[in-house]
Each structure stands twice: as structure tokens, then as C-alpha cells.
Amino acid sequence: MASELAMSNSDLPTSPLAMEYVNDFDLMKFEVKKEPVETDRIISQCGRLIAGGSLSSTPMSTPCSSVPPSPSFSAPSPGSGSEQKAHLEDYYWMTGYPQQLNPEALGFSPEDAVEALISNSHQLQGGFDGYARGAQQLASAAGAGAGASLGGSGEEMGPAAAVVSAVIAAAAAQSGAAPHYHHHHHHHHAAGHHHHPTAGAPGAAGSASASAGGAGGSGGGSGGPASAGGGGGGGGGGGGGAAGAGGALHPHHAAAGGLHFDDRFSDEQLVTMSVRELNRQLRGVSKEEVIRLKQKRRTLKNRGYAQSCRFKRVQQRHVLESEKNQLLQQVDHLKQEISRLVRERDAYKEKYEKLVSSGFRENGSSSDNPSSPEFFM
């Protein structure tokens, strides 16, 4: 969109010093009163601007107030080929910055604006068709959800009526009726998207300007692709609504990503992966998801440790039982040896006693034979 603005308005100043000079001042804070002698000239000038479609495409320029005009304000040449596109871009900035359009400074009522816009509606229709095609491509990259919600209330209005509603919304915002329009826009937005009802509220500080900008963005959409362009046509207010919608959708997207994040790592990968590798894989993930995955990893590791301890205990019990069986077998073998030795001892003892008894009988015939029992030992 910035490139189209640069192409359509080739006479804008390209010096960064001039743009910095304009941006450093808040032109709404000066509160310069208009001169009464210049009332007729200003009203006629504004009438020519509305009829000719030459509002400045720079947001900071306020050609219809008594503030010194911006260098970017200049009427387009009559023979330029981009005249219809300039019409559309001028209305785009007018709906995006309603705080610049002070009805007291313009000096005409909303009825005058309606007549001026209806008289120039045939030129606006041709420029709006070209703008809708460019806005459709922009909405496909930025997300058509917020644009469709902003364009929901403008499906039944034509392009001229949409710009008229934007002008009336700007006048109502300046006169103190901004809460009503903000509530109306919020109602349509909530009806269009139930999953983020708080989207479209840019903040308390710029609620009046954002509500008027949102109304202008909603009026900018007429039908299929133009409804997506309505969100971009809202300027500052529509952009704030889209940002709010993105912020409201962010937790849902994070939750949806978290549902499929467990499929990325199996239980075995979580257990075997090092802490450094896991932290590298979890970059850009929400804190709650990181805590949940690390808790799951700790639970799996504790479960594996408990299983290994149980296996070791069972294995050790089997080893001890096998050793016990071996020792029992050895004890039985020793008992058998003891019983065999006892039997041998008894046999030798019985033999000894027989020999001792036979030796006393033969002791009378041969005295040289030892008669002591130790002889047989």
C-alpha cells in the first residue's frame, strides 16, 4: 500500500527532514482559532477539495484548519492518469484519521458532505474497484479475518454511502458521540467472530478515533473481496482492530500448536534427549508448554528409574536364590560325607576291639610280644 501511495502521489516530498519536522509536532494540540475574515475562503476551498477529491494522502496534513499546511498538500494535475486512484487514496486517509476532520473547521454540515460525495460518486466507483483488487491481495497476507469482521456491517452499502458514513462517524466522534459508534462497531464484531469478542478495541486513549476509524473500515467493504479490504481501509482504527483480533487469537493458536506439539517428541525421545538439545528444540514455545513438557520428561525418567530398580531387585533376588540352592547342595554333600566317615569310624573301632580281645589270649605263650594295646595302634 505504501508503494501505491508513492506511485500515485509522485509530488509528495521525499526529504526525511520534512517528514521528521511534521511528525515532531502534534498538530491537534495547537488549538489555533480560525480567522473570521477567512471563513468564506476556507469553506470554498474545502468544497473544492471534497468535490475534486484532492485531500492530502499524508495523515499529518490538515488543509481545512488554520494550522500551517503540510508540504505534501497539493492539488493533482488535471491531466494526470492516476486521478481516480488519487481519489480513492484521499478517502482512505480521510477515514483512517477522523480526528483531523474537525466539522467546525470544515464549516459545512454532514448534509453538504453527502451532496458533494454523491455528485462525485461515479468517479469514486471506478477508483474503488481498482482499490478493492489491491486490497484483496493485502488482506490475504495480513489475515482476512479482521477485515471480514470489520466489513460485515458495510455489505449493504455502496462505496459512496460508505464514505458518507465515515464522514458522519468522524463528525460524531468530534461532537462526543464516539461511545455509541464504538459500541455499535463492537456489537457487529462480536457477532461476526465469537471466539474473540474483545477484538477491535485499540485502547482507552484513542477509543474515539479508533471507533470512527473502525466504522470507516466497516463501511469500506461491499461484498466479497471488498469486505476483506475494509479492514485495511480503516487506517489507524481498522489496524488497531486487526491487531486486537490477532492478540485475541494468539492464545488459541498457541493452544492449538500445543495440542500437536506432543506428536513432535515420543516418550523415548524425551527420555534419551539431553537437556541442551531439548532446550534448543523448545525455542519459541510458550513457557507453560515448556514447563509441561519438562514435567512429562521428569515423570518418564522417574518411571524408567523405578522400573530399572525393580528389575535389579528381581535379578538380585534370583541370584541370591541360586546361591542359596548351591549352598544347600553343598551342605547336603557335607552331611553325606560326615555320615560316611562316621560309618568308617565305627567299623575301625569294632575291628580294634576284636584285635584287642584276641591279643590277651595269646599273651601267655609269648611274653616278648608287647601286651600293650598301643602295639596295635
UniProtKB/Swiss-Prot annotation:
Q: Which Pfam families match?
A: bZIP_Maf (PF03131), Maf_N (PF08383)
State the name under which the record lists this protein.
Transcription factor Maf
Q: Which family does the record assign? A: Belongs to the bZIP family. Maf subfamily.
bZIP domain location is: 292-355
UniProt keyword list: Activator, DNA-binding, Isopeptide bond, Nucleus, Proto-oncogene, Repressor, Transcription, Transcription regulation, Tumor suppressor, Ubl conjugation
Leucine-zipper, as annotated region: 320-341
- Report whether Transcription shows up as a keyword of the record: yes
Q: Which GO terms describe its biological process?
A: lens fiber cell differentiation; regulation of transcription by RNA polymerase II
**Quaternary structure?**
Homodimer or heterodimer with other bHLH-Zip transcription factors. Binds DNA as a homodimer or as a heterodimer. Heterotetramer of two MAF and two USF2. Interacts with PAX6; the interaction is direct. Interacts with MYB; interaction takes place weakly in normal T-cells and increases in T-cells following stimulation through the TCR engagement. Interacts with MYB; the ternary complex formed with MYB and the CD13 promoter is regulated in response to differentiating signals. Interacts with USF2; the interaction inhibits its DNA-binding activity on the L7 promoter.
Kindly indicate whether the keyword Nucleus belongs to this entry. Answer: yes
Region of interest called Represses ARE-mediated transcription, as start-end residue ranges on this chain: 126-377
Q: Where in the cell is it found?
A: Nucleus
From start to end residue, where is composition biased (Gly residues)?
A: 213-244
Q: Where is this region: Disordered?
A: 57-84, 175-244, 358-377
Q: What is this protein for, i.e. what is its function?
A: Acts as a transcriptional activator or repressor. When overexpressed, represses anti-oxidant response element (ARE)-mediated transcription. Involved either as an oncogene or as a tumor suppressor, depending on the cell context. Binds to the ARE sites of detoxifying enzyme gene promoters. Involved in embryonic lens fiber cell development. Recruits the transcriptional coactivators CREBBP and/or EP300 to crystallin promoters leading to up-regulation of crystallin gene during lens fiber cell differentiation. Activates the expression of IL4 in T-helper 2 (Th2) cells.
Q: Where is the composition biased (Polar residues)?
A: 363-377
In terms of one coarse class, where is the protein primarily found? nucleus
Q: What is one GO cellular-component annotation here? A: nucleus
Cross-linked residues for Glycyl lysine isopeptide (Lys-Gly) (interchain with G-Cter in SUMO2) are 29, 33, 335
**Domain of life the protein comes from:** Eukaryota
Q: Name one GO molecular function term.
A: DNA-binding transcription factor activity, RNA polymerase II-specific
After translation, the protein is modified as follows:
Ubiquitinated, leading to its degradation by the proteasome. Ubiquitination is triggered by glucocorticoids. Phosphorylated by GSK3 and MAPK13 on serine and threonine residues. The phosphorylation status can serve to either stimulate or inhibit transcription.
Gene label: MAF
Per the record, which residues fall in region Basic motif?
Answer: 292-317
Bias regions of kind Low complexity — which residues? 72-82, 198-212
